[in-house]
Amino acid sequence: MNIERLKEIREDEDYKQSDIAKVLNTTQQQYSKYELGLQVIPVERLVKLAKFYNTSVGYLIGLTNERKPYPKA
């Protein structure tokens, strides 16, 4: 997983860790562990982040460099 991308996209969008923690209904400390790679982020939270940032889970985890979300079927 490309953990650097979590921090990169958050900073690009001018959010603090505490802002994203609220979106994910978790603590800033927990979210920090995700960004640092100390804990694996659950799939449900990745999906929530992808929707929040209007991108794909594939982009967040580094499977693609295309930031646009996948087209809806």
Language-model-detected regions and their locations in the chain:
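Recognition helix of helix-turn-helix/homeodomain-like DNA-binding domains
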Residues: N25-V40
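DNA major-groove recognition helix of helix-turn-helix/homeodomain DNA-binding modules
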Residues: N25, E44-Y59
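Short basic helix-loop element that most often maps to the first helix and adjoining turn
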Residues: E4-V23, K48
